[in-house]
From Swiss-Prot:
<dbReference type="InterPro" id="IPR054608">
    <property type="entry name" value="SYY-like_C"/>
</dbReference>
<keyword id="KW-0547">Nucleotide-binding</keyword>
<dbReference type="Pfam" id="PF00579">
    <property type="entry name" value="tRNA-synt_1b"/>
</dbReference>
<comment type="similarity">
    <text>Belongs to the class-I aminoacyl-tRNA synthetase family. TyrS type 1 subfamily.</text>
</comment>
<dbReference type="GO" id="GO:0005524">
    <property type="term" value="F:ATP binding"/>
</dbReference>
<dbReference type="InterPro" id="IPR002305">
    <property type="entry name" value="aa-tRNA-synth_Ic"/>
</dbReference>
<feature type="domain" description="S4 RNA-binding">
    <location>
        <begin position="353"/>
        <end position="419"/>
    </location>
</feature>
<feature type="short sequence motif" description="'KMSKS' region">
    <location>
        <begin position="231"/>
        <end position="235"/>
    </location>
</feature>
<keyword id="KW-0694">RNA-binding</keyword>
<dbReference type="GO" id="GO:0003723">
    <property type="term" value="F:RNA binding"/>
</dbReference>
<dbReference type="InterPro" id="IPR002307">
    <property type="entry name" value="Tyr-tRNA-ligase"/>
</dbReference>
<dbReference type="GO" id="GO:0004831">
    <property type="term" value="F:tyrosine-tRNA ligase activity"/>
</dbReference>
<dbReference type="InterPro" id="IPR001412">
    <property type="entry name" value="aa-tRNA-synth_I_CS"/>
</dbReference>
<dbReference type="GO" id="GO:0005829">
    <property type="term" value="C:cytosol"/>
</dbReference>
<dbReference type="InterPro" id="IPR024088">
    <property type="entry name" value="Tyr-tRNA-ligase_bac-type"/>
</dbReference>
<dbReference type="InterPro" id="IPR036986">
    <property type="entry name" value="S4_RNA-bd_sf"/>
</dbReference>
<feature type="binding site">
    <location>
        <position position="169"/>
    </location>
    <ligand>
        <name>L-tyrosine</name>
    </ligand>
</feature>
């Protein structure tokens, strides 16, 4: 650990937006090996998406460097709602929904961080026990309203209005940092760029209650933008989730492998644990042999393995290779559903049918003449096999549990035909 400068590594990766006291943090790291740091997430949903993943990658880097990560599940703050990054009030969730989301997020975090040298806590455990008078007497007196109004997250909402509930959020997050510092030995908070005001409020509270020399540090990460200026984290189909039931490992892998050459090195620095030398070599490959897309393949491999494990990566690569080569016959029925979930689809009955009629009836071909021409020219594949016989009969029961027939026209145009009884 002494030979690894975590802060210099983060700077090289472009992962630091602001720090509260770099000199003080460096001094602390030089003298102590017990730094504990945290990042929080409110249970507003039952899965993180890749945009949420960014600060947790920083936390993971500290864990790999030997430090102690703590994750705060915001069971308390989540019942109120963080105004950061929003122009409108959040819709409050039911207690049942919040608890379900807490359990799901906890499971995801354990998958990413393991169980060694890692803790998960829930701020419901302290915020839920605090009554109104305690809140006002012990903490409310320490916050100046004029300072709170100047925080960007609040100031940006004043024109259209912000409820007292969301206005109070920064106090609750500050209390989180104070409690973690006092009772759990946590010295540092990590968050997105929009969390700067909340983080500094927590540090101020710690210094007021525990003394100005109490170690407390904050670090925010930059807003992640793509080369075209749009916000990172969305695909054409919406958010890219960590939950494999929401975004399959194949879709997850495809998101990363399809990244722009202009973005791929930045993402390798942010989302992988590859050494500087390997990333530098991949950057050179992007410049000299971009058509090989080696950087994208490495990115997709590393992030998919981190989130979905070796098994998820293997499935993603199996499906990708099958679609690329056209050899789909070895895919399972489940893999077919995943791989062609967004492909054009059609329906057909259970009976055997002449291929030409099948192509026209499912509207894959516009006419029998065109269908015969494409079959004769070798442009039609049925379940991975090239068919050049216009008298060929399609047997829906022949593959994929009788649920599908996969038609490929040309090199990449797939249609998934659902068989209806």
């Amino acid at each position: 650990m002494a030979n690894f400068d975590i802060l210099e590594d983060l700077k090289w990766r472009g992962a630091i937006n602001q720090e509260t006291d770099e000199e003080g943090l460096r001094d602390y790291l030089a003298k102590h090996d017990d730094l504990a740091l945290y990042c929080g997430t409110d249970p507003t949903g039952d899965s993180l998406h890749i945009g949420h993943l960014i600060p947790f990658m920083i936390l993971k880097r500290f864990q790999l460097a030997g430090y102690k990560p703590v994750i705060v599940i915001g069971g308390g703050t989540g019942s109120i709602g963080d105004p950061s990054g929003r122009s409108t009030e959040r819709v409050l969730q039911s207690e049942e929904t919040i608890k379900h989301n807490e359990e799901a997020l906890t499971a995801q975090m354990v998958k990413l961080f393991g169980t060694e040298n890692f803790r998960i806590v829930n701020n419901r455990d302290w915020l839920g026990k605090m009554n109104l008078l305690e809140f006002l007497r012990d903490y409310g007196k320490l916050f100046q309203v004029n300072n709170m109004l100047n925080k960007e997250v609040v100031a940006s909402r004043l024109k259209n209005g912000i409820s007292f509930t969301e206005f109070s959020y920064q106090i609750l997050q500050a209390i989180d940092f104070y409690i973690l510092n006092r009772d759990h030995g946590v010295q540092m908070q990590i968050g997105g760029a929009d969390q700067w005001g909340n983080i500094t409020a927590g540090i101020d509270l710690i210094h007021r209650l525990e003394g100005a020399d109490r170690p407390a540090f904050g670090l925010t990460i930059p807003l992640m933008l793509k080369a075209d200026g749009t916000k990172f984290g969305k695909s054409a189909g919406g958010a890219v989730w960590l939950d494999p039931e929401k975004t399959s490992p194949y879709e997850f892998y495809q998101f990363w492998i399809n990244q722009d050459d202009r973005d791929v090195i930045k993402y390798l620095k942010y989302f992988t644990f590859l050494k500087h030398e390997e990333i530098d070599a991949l950057e050179e490959k992007v410049k000299t042999e971009p058509w090989k897309r080696e950087a994208q393949k490495r990115l997709a491999e590393e992030v998919t393995k981190f989130v979905h494990g070796e098994e998820g990566l293997k499935e993603a690569q199996t499906v990708t290779e099958a679609l690329f080569s056209g050899n789909v016959k070895d895919l399972t029925t489940k893999q077919v559903e995943i791989a062609l979930a967004k492909a054009p689809s059609a329906e057909s009955g259970e009976e055997k049918k002449n291929l030409v009629d099948f192509l026209v009836d499912t509207k894959i071909e516009s006419s029998k003449r065109q269908a015969r021409e494409d079959v004769n020219n070798g442009a039609i594949y049925v379940n991975g096999d090239r068919i050049q016989d216009t008298d060929f009969e399609v047997d829906p029961a022949a593959a994929f549990d009788g649920k599908f027939v996969i038609i490929r026209k040309g090199k990449k145009k797939y249609t998934l035909v659902h068989i209806k009884g």
